[in-house]
A protein has these predicted regions:
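Secretory targeting signatures
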Residues: 1-49
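Early extracytoplasmic/lumenal segment of secretory-pathway proteins
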Residues: 49-121, 250
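A structural signal for short loop-to-beta-strand junctions that line the ligand-binding cleft
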Residues: 106-114, 129-168, 183, 193-200
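Periplasmic solute-binding protein
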Residues: 116-127, 145-177, 206-216, 295-301
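Short beta-strand->loop
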Residues: 128-138, 153-154, 183-186, 273-294, ...
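Ligand-binding pocket segment of bilobal, Venus flytrap-like solute-binding proteins
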Residues: 212-287
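Mature extracytoplasmic/periplasmic domains
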Residues: 298, 303-363
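Conserved C-terminal helix/tail region of periplasmic/extracytoplasmic solute-binding proteins
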Residues: 358-389
């Protein structure tokens, strides 16, 4: 995010698709390579020590990004314990597209940051090697089902998409926004005009929001999902769908910005942690007193063609271990996949995820991967027809 609570550092978000920026880092036109092997940050030129090199593709904001205590702890500790060099690379654009382009001559050993939408895509292309990690015994089976039932991607963190809203808007609606339904936006021009979304044709957060809305309409309302967009899109002025999450949140958090933005339910906890509790809150989609949301699940996978399968597996085991999982809530601002790891008390500011019914359970990763191209094409047709020029 390029705007944040006063006095707080910029909060990173993962970069997994074209147009999506992190709160701290932007990907350069070429991959940035960072080496971690107990020597800090440096370009890896080869040490001549005969130690193996593990190449990891991920997003620039992982564990706060290079140089942070959490990032260095995760990679340096593993490198020292296993006598291995680690190259962390941040490919431009989409992780799946990078892996697919290199499929005939794989470069990476591991990929961190695939989600419930991109992981099944990677699996469909044969890009991943399944691994049934022992640590999955402490991971809820639901998370595994939602990202990769075949263990091609192993979940390490999760969360929920949310609709963030300002305290001022909550007051104007007498608190009604806290239990908003999608039909509330479809039938209220004021609400629709104050909702800033991300363009799903270029942004992963936008894709996830589109899937959330579709599943809500199909599973909860049993209605045509296009009705929502045809009703709200004519009011997308001046706040047209943003090209990425960072742009959207920056606009939301700037003076005179929209009252609501599609983001993540952990945002209020982040704001409270950095000294502005209640600056904004977050909600999911409600109906008849029940909360429904879209669960985002992030995983790590072994790249098909890796030359270091045993090291790959040991790194995944490390990523699921308590010491690493403890770093997730205050660095990734997500929930740890390891259910034995507690989240800090500041998460009381976020909506209780235990009270949200995940819409993911009504579909499967494979179904989403197969349906997404058609959904995006339909969305684009609606946008062309209804969004004001």
């Amino acid at each position: 995010m390029t705007a944040a609570p006063p006095g707080s550092p910029l909060r990173p978000r993962r970069l997994r698709a074209p147009g999506r920026i992190g709160r701290l880092f932007k990907v350069a036109a070429v991959a940035l390579i960072v080496t971690v092997a107990g020597v800090g940050l440096a370009a890896y030129l080869g040490s001549g020590l005969g130690e193996p090199t593990l190449i990891i593709y991920t997003y620039p904001s992982l564990f706060g990004g290079p140089g942070t205590a959490a990032y260095n702890y995760v990679f340096d500790t593993f490198a020292a314990a296993h006598h291995v060099h680690i190259e962390v690379e941040f490919p431009p654009g989409n992780l799946v597209s990078t892996l697919r382009a290199e499929q005939n001559a794989p470069v990476a050993d591991l990929v961190i940051g695939l989600d419930e939408i991109t992981a099944p895509q990677a699996e469909s292309y044969g890009l991943l090697v399944p691994y049934s990690a022992p640590g999955l015994a402490d991971v809820p089976a639901q998370l595994v089902r939602e990202i990769s039932p075949s263990h091609g991607a192993v979940p390490y963190e999760w969360g929920y998409l949310g609709i963030d809203y300002t305290s001022a808007f909550a007051n104007r609606t007498n608190g009604a926004v806290a239990h908003a339904t999608f039909p509330d936006f479809a039938t209220n021009a004021t609400w629709a005009s104050q909702l800033l979304t991300e363009d799903p044709t270029v942004d992963i957060t936008g894709e996830e929001f589109l899937v959330w809305e579709i599943q809500y309409y199909e599973q909860v309302l049993h209605q045509n999902w296009t009705e929502f967009w045809s009703a709200v899109m004519p009011h997308f002025s001046p706040y047209k769908p943003a090209p990425d999450w960072g742009t959207a949140f920056n606009e939301f958090s700037s003076p005179g910005g929209p009252a609501m933005v599609v983001s993540y339910t952990s945002d209020p906890a982040y704001a409270a942690y950095y000294g502005t509790p209640g600056a904004y809150n977050s909600t999911v989609s409600w109906w008849n007193g029940a909360a429904y949301g879209w669960q985002t699940v992030y995983g790590v996978g072994i790249v098909n063609g890796s030359r270091h399968l045993r090291l790959d597996q040991e790194f995944i085991d490390w990523l699921l271990s308590g010491p690493v999982q403890t770093e997730i809530p205050l660095n990734e601002w997500e929930y740890p996949a390891n259910s034995t790891v507690a989240v800090p008390s500041v998460y009381v500011w976020a909506p209780n995820p235990d009270l949200i019914q995940p819409l993911n359970v009504g579909t499967s990763p494979a179904q989403i991967a197969a349906s997404l191209p058609g959904w995006l094409a339909t969305y684009q047709e609606l946008a062309t027809q209804y969004i004001p020029p």
